[in-house]
Design a protein with these regions (language model features):
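Conserved metal-binding segment of the jelly-roll/cupin
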Residues: 139-157
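Glycine-rich loops and low-complexity Gly/Arg-rich segments
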Residues: 141-145, 164, 172-174, 190-192
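Non-catalytic, conserved peripheral segments adjacent to functional cores
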Residues: 2-137, 175-178, 182-183, 188-192
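A short pocket-lining beta-strand/turn micro-motif at the edge of beta-sheets
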Residues: 114-116, 136, 142-144, 162-165
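A short beta-strand-loop micro-motif that forms or neighbors metal/cofactor-
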Residues: 152-179
């Protein structure tokens, strides 16, 4: 077995081994989940909220989309939109990778009214990646859908349930032709 002698150390105060480097940093980075509000989520996307709908032929009800605050603008360019239901099993609240899409504003929402979590970081230019301290996490109520801005880095959906169904609106080829992934330098844990 080879042991490292003081003379074998790397210059410039670098760690002696990869193991020393890992041990010098915390094992996980905690990110406290915050409540989902328009103001807090604005840098990352929009919130689609339920609204009361009138009867189709009710003359007392007039629908004016320009006066509604429950609508969000969708970006579905350079591809064919697809709506799908994702059935996901328990994934826990830790993650070590984030992804983004540069051509589409992705929408996600729980179909069963279950709360869930999403970690996000603001869109970055070109190939630059977000810093760990710029990652935020949100608790998404089961009656909300989120729309991520084009290019928003994200990890999730995450949840504590055994399984969950999600509605996902994106381009058909989003996860093949419009998918950029990054590995984080540290495992992140969403804290409740």
């Amino acid at each position: 077995m080879h042991s490292i002698k003081p003379s074998d150390k790397l210059q410039n105060n670098q760690p002696e081994t990869l193991l020393d480097s890992v041990m010098d940093s915390p094992a996980q980075r905690s990110i406290r989940a915050q409540d989902l509000t328009d103001e807090a989520f604005a840098p990352y996307g929009d919130i689609i909220k339920p609204r009361i709908s009138g009867e189709q032929f009710d003359r007392a009800y007039s629908y004016d989309p320009s006066k509604e605050n429950t609508h969000v603008k969708l970006v579905m360019t350079n591809g064919e939109p697809t709506l799908r239901i994702m059935h996901q099993r328990l994934r826990g609240l830790t993650f070590s990778k984030m992804a983004r899409h540069r051509r589409v504003s992705q929408r996600l929402g729980s179909l069963q009214g279950k709360e869930w979590f999403m970690a996000v970081a603001t869109p970055t230019n070109n190939d630059s990646q977000p810093r760990l301290e710029d990652i935020a996490a949100f608790l998404i109520p089961g009656d909300r859908i989120i729309k991520l801005h084009v290019g928003t880095w994200h990890a999730g959906p995450h949840f504590k349930h055994e399984e969950c169904l999600f509605l996902n609106l994106e381009n058909e080829d989003t996860n093949t032709r419009d998918f950029q992934e990054m590995t984080l330098p540290q495992v992140c844990q969403i804290e409740i």
